[in-house]
């Protein structure tokens, strides 16, 4: 029968049972009480003897003996109280373990036992992680320990400099501990600095850092904030969080801007407003045009406030305050320097403008309309430069000033002088009148950046590009040769290639044909010209381009026309190769580029039907054929009909230069062709044929004689050719024909003798040599004749 129905159970024992069960949920019994619970598992004899001793039965049987009425005496209850332990929560136990580890650390660090200290510090770190996982937080005494360890480590390092007594294993443990303590200090840097400043705030060691921070915030919130700074604080705290409506924040900040706000409030508002707008477009290809123009307007308003204010300055060297509504301390001049960067805001605005151009169709009217905003951004850059110059003490060492100067240079270096002059007049009309010429502007900006190690080479490349674009080839060449760009960083590759190509184009415009050909040779023959000039990708999948490759791309209006580049290169090849072909020089000594041009001519000659020239290449090939015949006038007409020359700003002068070069090279080609036919030629006749002055003809002929291109002398109005040891073209063809006839005759003899060569009579031998002939016949029969020419 169940014990519930055993006699001895009554209502009084039931009520006592409920009270005792509730008390058991609140108290944890000692080990002695657990021994008493084990009486239940005794055998039957002991249970029967317990019943005789008056022990309870029924439901009361399962209750603790010490809680029942009449069970035991005062001595029993006293013994139970003595055996009962103090109960601690999980948090208290964890704190005790931490304090025990800290005590071990403090003891062993005094004896420089760093192995034990490291072991206990790692153990303490695990306990800290457990505390954070259970939402107990990091106690304040952990920060005190970090400060104490930092001091001990510093002292030990100083002692070790004098006498190195630390063992190898101790040194390894010490260095490991040093790095981990440094890492932990960095993680709790705010509290660490606060402890160093006000140690009294950490007297309550068991308090967690989270609750301590909340208490600090509660004390700070007792100070009332103005509506502007209250909203600013809310917006700043929400930055970086998900699901935040940026447009709503922009609307809120725009509504806070009013004439009643102080200068400090307006400066803070504009900084936050500009940053929020930039953040809103961070996940887009480029910033919306309306938002970009709003940021440009607000940045101009911010500069207006900064220029007018004599109390506040915005600089990267400014002071940061703990609260956004607290103004920085004034300096000796009474000026409060606020932490911020006008240069960074201008850089970001300019980058968004560039990305907008890169993501717009360059052949559409949208691109042209967007490009009109470049004047506005340039005016803003000039304003920013003027403001930074007014607040910076050491201009040469200011990085923010160097950055904005480089930005200004990037917007004008590729333009002709007329556009630069217009931009400068528009930018300075509201600041102060400027009397500098475009070349003086470029030179002053470049000279300023030469003191900056980061931007010096970049500025010099921009300067070279500018001089090359505006026709000052000698100046650009001098700068390029003196710069030693071969020691520069690879980040300058695009700028270097652009400057080099523009230098080659400038050499062509100035009449330095051979130099232009050498400069442009490698770039034109490269398969990666677009990529090397920052004008596109050569891969089949542009979407796979990296971020760095996309950043190197330039807007379309800064591109160098690759068709113009190829046209200039082929024209240079024409002017160099046609006289070289007529001179009958050793073809092995010719450059590979000239051979490729000759192959184009040979390919054209093999065509059965050739129509009128259509492409740029066709015009140049037809002009080459005309020049070979000495018809320089036809060659000039073909070249001048190419419309791409109009891309040069001074195309009239360019065509005049090309005409003169064609006349000179036509004269040289004529001399090379007919020097073996004529014994002398009239200089006046040559002058009339090629449209040159007699003085110029005499000068060209004299140069050819000095370079040993021809043998002769200029005598009065004639050039007299002497006997030329060099074979003529007809003689060379006759010699080649004779060699081939001999080869054909020998081959026919071998064929008629069934593969045997014709034997001389002196070689007739008896039958003993027949075996040797038999062995050698395959050598004659297998002659390779694939290379024979007929």
Curated annotation (Swiss-Prot):
Keywords assigned: Cytoplasm, Initiation factor, Protein biosynthesis
Biased composition (Polar residues): 751-770
Main location: cytoplasm
InterPro entries to which the protein is assigned, alphabetical: EIF3C, EIF3C_N_dom, PCI_dom
GO CC list: cytoplasmic stress granule; eukaryotic 43S preinitiation complex; eukaryotic 48S preinitiation complex; eukaryotic translation initiation factor 3 complex, eIF3e; eukaryotic translation initiation factor 3 complex, eIF3m; multi-eIF complex
GO biological process: formation of cytoplasmic translation initiation complex
Molecular-function GO term, any one: translation initiation factor activity
Compositionally skewed regions (Acidic residues) per UniProt: 14-53
Ranges where the record places region Disordered: 1-62, 748-790
Record domain PCI: where: 556-728
Subunit annotation: Component of the eukaryotic translation initiation factor 3 (eIF-3) complex.
Protein family: Belongs to the eIF-3 subunit C family.
Record protein name field: Eukaryotic translation initiation factor 3 subunit C
Species for this entry: Lodderomyces elongisporus (strain ATCC 11503 / CBS 2605 / JCM 1781 / NBRC 1676 / NRRL YB-4239) (Yeast)
């Amino acid at each position: 029968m169940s014990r519930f129905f055993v006699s001895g159970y009554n209502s009084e024992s039931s009520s006592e049972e409920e009270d005792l069960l509730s008390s058991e949920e609140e108290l944890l019994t000692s080990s002695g009480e657990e021994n008493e619970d084990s009486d239940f598992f005794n055998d039957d004899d002991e249970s029967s003897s317990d019943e005789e001793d008056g022990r309870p039965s029924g439901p009361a049987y399962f209750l603790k003996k010490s809680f029942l009425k009449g069970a035991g005496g005062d001595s029993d209850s006293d013994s139970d109280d003595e055996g009962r332990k103090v109960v601690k929560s999980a948090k208290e136990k964890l704190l005790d373990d931490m304090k025990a580890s800290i005590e071990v650390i403090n003891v062993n660090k005094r004896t420089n036992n760093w192995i034990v200290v490291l072991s206990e510090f790692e153990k303490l770190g695990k306990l800290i992680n457990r505390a954070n996982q259970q939402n107990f937080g990091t106690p304040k005494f952990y920060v005190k320990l970090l400060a104490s360890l930092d001091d001990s480590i510093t002292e030990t390092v100083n002692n070790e400099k004098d006498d190195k007594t630390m063992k190898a294993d101790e040194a390894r443990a010490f260095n490991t501990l040093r790095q981990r303590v440094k890492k932990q200090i960095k993680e709790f840097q705010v509290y660490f600095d606060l402890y160093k400043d006000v140690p009294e705030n950490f007297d309550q060691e068991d308090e967690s850092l989270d609750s301590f921070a909340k208490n600090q915030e509660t004390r700070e919130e007792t100070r009332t904030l103005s509506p502007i700074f209250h909203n600013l604080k809310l917006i700043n705290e929400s930055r970086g969080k998900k699901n935040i409506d940026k447009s709503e924040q922009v609307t809120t900040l725009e509504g806070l801007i009013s004439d009643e706000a102080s200068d400090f409030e307006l400066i803070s508002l504009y900084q936050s407003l500009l940053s929020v707008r930039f953040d809103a477009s961070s996940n887009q290809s480029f910033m919306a045009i309306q938002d970009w123009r709003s940021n440009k307007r607000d940045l101009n308003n911010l500069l207006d406030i900064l220029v007018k204010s004599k109390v506040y300055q915005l600089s990267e060297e400014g002071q940061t305050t703990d609260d956004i509504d607290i103004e920085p301390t004034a300096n000796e001049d009474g000026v409060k320097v606020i932490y911020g960067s006008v240069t960074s805001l201008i850089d970001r605005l300019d980058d968004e403008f560039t990305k907008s151009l890169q993501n717009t169709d360059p052949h559409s009217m949208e691109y042209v309309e967007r490009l009109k905003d470049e004047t506005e951004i340039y005016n803003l850059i000039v304003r920013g430069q003027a403001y930074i110059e007014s607040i910076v003490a050491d201009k040469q060492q200011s990085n923010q000033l160097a950055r904005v100067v480089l930005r200004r240079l990037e917007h004008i270096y590729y333009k002709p002088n007329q556009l630069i002059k217009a931009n400068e007049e528009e930018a300075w009309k509201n600041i102060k009148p400027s009397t500098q010429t475009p070349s003086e502007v470029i030179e002053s900006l470049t000279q300023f950046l030469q003191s900056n190690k980061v931007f010096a080479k970049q500025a010099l490349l921009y300067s070279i590009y500018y001089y090359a674009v505006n026709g000052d080839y000698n100046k650009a060449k001098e700068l390029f040769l003196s710069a030693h760009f071969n020691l520069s960083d690879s980040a300058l590759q695009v700028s270097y290639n652009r400057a080099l190509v523009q230098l080659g184009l400038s050499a062509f415009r100035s009449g330095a044909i051979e130099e232009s050909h050498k400069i442009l040779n490698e770039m034109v023959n490269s398969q990666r010209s677009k990529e090397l000039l920052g004008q596109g990708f050569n891969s089949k999948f542009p979407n796979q381009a990296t971020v760095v490759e996309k950043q190197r791309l330039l807007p379309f209006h800064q591109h160098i026309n690759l068709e113009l580049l190829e046209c200039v290169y082929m024209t240079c090849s024409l002017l160099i190769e046609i006289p070289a072909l007529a001179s009958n020089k050793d073809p092995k000594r010719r450059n590979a580029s000239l051979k490729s041009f000759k192959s184009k001519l040979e390919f054209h000659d093999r065509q059965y039907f050739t129509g009128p020239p259509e492409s740029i290449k066709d015009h140049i090939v037809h002009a080459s054929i005309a020049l070979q015949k000495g018809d320089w006038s036809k060659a000039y007409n073909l070249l001048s009909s190419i419309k791409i020359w109009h891309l040069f700003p001074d195309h009239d002068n360019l065509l005049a230069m090309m005409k003169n070069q064609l006349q000179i090279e036509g004269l040289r080609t004529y001399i090379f062709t007919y020097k073996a036919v004529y014994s002398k030629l009239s200089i006046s006749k040559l002058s009339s044929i090629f449209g040159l002055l007699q003085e110029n003809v005499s000068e060209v002929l004299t140069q050819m004689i000095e370079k040993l291109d021809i043998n002769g002398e200029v005598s009065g109005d004639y050039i007299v050719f002497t006997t030329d040891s060099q074979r003529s073209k007809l003689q060379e063809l006759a010699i080649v024909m004779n060699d081939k006839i001999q080869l054909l005759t020998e081959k026919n003899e071998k064929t008629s003798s069934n593969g045997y060569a014709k034997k001389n009579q002196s070689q007739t031998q008896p039958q003993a040599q027949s075996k040797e002939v038999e062995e050698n016949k395959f050598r004659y029969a297998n002659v390779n004749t694939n290379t024979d020419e007929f």
